[in-house]
Structures are given as structure tokens and as C-alpha cells.
């Protein structure tokens, strides 16, 4: 029976709280996936809340026609947008989800979504930990991950703070946002233009009765 351990530590104001918490279940798994840097640009056309055009900062941006991307800006992210016909530094897009696009002239980061194969049944999940890890401890970029069933229908989506693990201790009382059909894959991206990231996932789940 696999076991995961996580720790909670809070200190200050003359007090200290520290606890190691072990969790066990019938099964579990791990994923570590490299996420390349995003590319800088400017929103130069805002047609509606999820349609527009970005002018990339350089011609070697690598964003291609038909790519599936997440778009980041200060205070928001729109995920699962589809890129139209790319011409030079001009990148049109449509169909994103999440936050409404900002105003014209806003600096943005365009990041191609990376596929992560999973075998995760949220209904039997007991603990899930996730972290967007950067070697640069000063990195502050927000990143994003979306979980899907085989439909593909969205099961859950999360914003990820740089180098800040999130732990869903479901057996310990945390809300389970991953319930529904089994999760077969996720798409994640990197909101930083300077530092590559490693997405880390650890989870435990009990066997279905």
C-alpha cells in the first residue's frame, strides 16, 4: 500500500505549528513533465472576450497555426485557445476559456499547452499534490493546468503559483474538485518567458469497490 507524506509548518508571532501527515491508499502514481517557456507578445486586436490577435515580440516565437495555447497577462489567464493562421509575428486566436481578454495593448505571454497522460479516478482520489517547480526560486509566474475525461470534457482547472505546492488532502477533509468521469489526460503550460518549469503531480487513490 503506497504512502505519501506531506508537512505543514507555520511559525511566527512567537508560535510554531508543525506536523507531518502520512496518507496511504490502495494505489498511486507520479508524473513529472517539463514545460517550455512561453513567448512574449502584445494583444493588438480584441474582437470579443475570447477572440483576438497577438503581435509577438519576435519572429522566432514558434507558435504555429492550429496550436492549442494558454494566454497569460498580469491578473488573468485564458486557456484552451486555438491559434488561427499565423503570419510572421501575427498570431490570431479564438475559443479560449477562463478570464475575459484584457484591453488592447496589454502585454501577454502565449504558451503552447503540453499533453500529460493520466490514469486518475477522481471519485476514488484520496490525495493529490501538484507543483509548478522552477530552478529559479525568485520566479513568480502564474501557470495553468486543465484536467479532462475521455470526451474530452473538462473535469477541473487550476492556476499554479510558481514553486508553491498545492495539496488536496481529500481523505483529510479537503474539497474534491476532481470528481466525475475518470481523468485520462491534462494540458498544462508555463506562464514564464524566462524560466522553463517542471510540473510535478503525485496522487493516491483507493480501488473502486
Task: Describe each region flagged by the PLM.
Residues 172-198:
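Noncatalytic modules at the cell exterior or secretory-pathway interfaces
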Residues 62-65, 125, 160:
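Short, well-ordered loop/turn sites that connect or cap secondary structure elements
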Residues 69-71, 123-134:
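A short beta-strand element within beta-rich, extracytoplasmic domains
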Residues 76-78, 133-143, 191-195:
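Extended, low-complexity, turn-rich repeat/linker tracts enriched in Gly/Pro/Ser/Thr and Asp/Glu
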Residues 1-18, 189-209:
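C-terminal interaction-tip segments
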Residues 37-113:
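Small/polar beta-strand repeat architecture
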Residues 1-42, 113-125:
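N-terminal low-complexity, intrinsically disordered "leader/linker" segments enriched in small/polar
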Residues 131-158:
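Short, surface-exposed beta-strand/strand-loop-strand elements in extracellular ectodomains
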Amino acid at each position: 500500500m503506497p504512502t505519501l507524506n506531506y508537512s505543514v509548518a507555520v511559525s511566527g508571532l512567537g508560535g510554531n505549528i508543525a506536523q507531518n501527515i502520512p496518507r496511504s491508499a490502495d494505489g498511486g502514481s507520479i508524473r513529472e513533465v517539463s514545460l517550455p517557456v512561453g513567448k512574449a507578445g502584445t494583444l493588438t486586436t480584441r474582437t470579443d472576450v475570447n477572440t483576438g490577435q497577438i503581435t509577438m515580440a519576435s519572429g522566432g516565437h514558434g507558435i504555429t497555426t492550429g496550436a492549442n495555447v494558454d494566454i497569460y497577462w498580469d491578473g488573468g489567464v485564458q486557456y484552451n485557445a486555438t491559434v488561427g493562421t499565423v503570419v510572421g509575428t501575427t498570431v490570431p486566436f479564438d475559443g479560449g476559456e477562463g478570464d475575459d481578454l484584457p484591453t488592447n495593448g496589454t502585454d501577454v505571454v502565449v504558451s503552447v499547452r503540453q499533453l500529460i497522460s493520466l490514469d486518475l479516478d477522481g471519485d476514488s482520489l484520496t490525495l493529490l499534490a501538484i507543483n509548478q517547480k522552477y530552478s529559479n526560486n525568485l520566479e513568480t509566474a502564474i501557470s495553468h493546468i486543465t484536467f479532462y475525461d475521455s470526451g474530452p470534457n473538462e473535469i477541473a482547472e487550476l492556476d499554479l503559483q510558481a514553486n508553491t505546492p498545492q495539496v488536496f488532502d481529500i481523505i483529510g477533509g479537503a474539497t474534491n474538485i476532481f470528481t466525475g468521469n475518470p481523468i485520462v489526460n491534462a494540458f498544462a503550460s508555463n506562464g514564464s518567458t524566462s524560466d522553463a518549469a517542471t510540473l510535478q503531480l503525485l496522487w493516491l487513490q483507493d480501488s473502486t469497490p
